[in-house]
Amino acid sequence: MNNLSPLEVAIADFQAAKTTPELIRATKNLCDLRTIEAIPILIEGLGFNNPAVASVATSGLIELGSQAVPSLLVSLDEKNYGSRAWVVRALASIRDPRSLDLLEHALATDIAPSVRRSAARGLAELNLIYPEDRSKLERCLLALLAAIKDDEWVVRYAVIFGIELHLRRYNPNNKNHCILALKQLSSDSESIKVIRLRAKLALQRLASS
């Protein structure tokens, strides 16, 4: 292997790894190279049904930032929940506007609560500029508003965070609709106490800002 490049060595180690510790070590070595050429292998690691390996690979992809987005966008495996969850988490953390379509779709339709929660966080924090990106910001907010009745409280919690963030940072046309949504989530019609409290906190912060 003396004639191999560091990337080739790291890929060979990754492909030869048999145990979780070996896979983690090989994945970390790939991440440490900080090269876009490692992206396909890191994405492969997201689908191993091994959370420890996927977590390391996701961190490496996030560190590569927008360079990883095109490959992540085309790698979504609708049949592999684990891989899908990590891909959406990575895209949400990178915050690249090119992820908007995928995050919208994931929040609205994905069967996995963790995927919907990550999508909500991603829509809250995409790197968009107001007012230049007003139309995209409105899409993000509309997607969040549509998810306020999500069956899973962890998703509703992320939605509250997103709505509050949008109202504090921008001046959306449907601000009153957002306030009404938060009031609904803070009322007794919401069965989960932590959701009521989080919505009340959002309203208090918005009132004082």
Swiss-Prot record:
Keyword Protein transport among UniProt keywords: no
Molecular-function annotations in GO: lyase activity; oxidoreductase activity
Gene Ontology cellular component terms for the protein in this record: phycobilisome
Keywords tagged on the record: Antenna complex, Lyase, Phycobilisome
Role played: An enzyme involved in the biosynthesis of bilin. Might be involved in the specific attachment of phycoerythrobilin (PEB) to the R-phycocyanin II alpha chain.
PANTHER family, per the entry: PBS LYASE HEAT DOMAIN PROTEIN REPEAT-CONTAINING PROTEIN (PTHR12697:SF38), PBS LYASE HEAT-LIKE PROTEIN (PTHR12697)
Protein name: Bilin biosynthesis protein RpcF
Protein's gene: rpcF
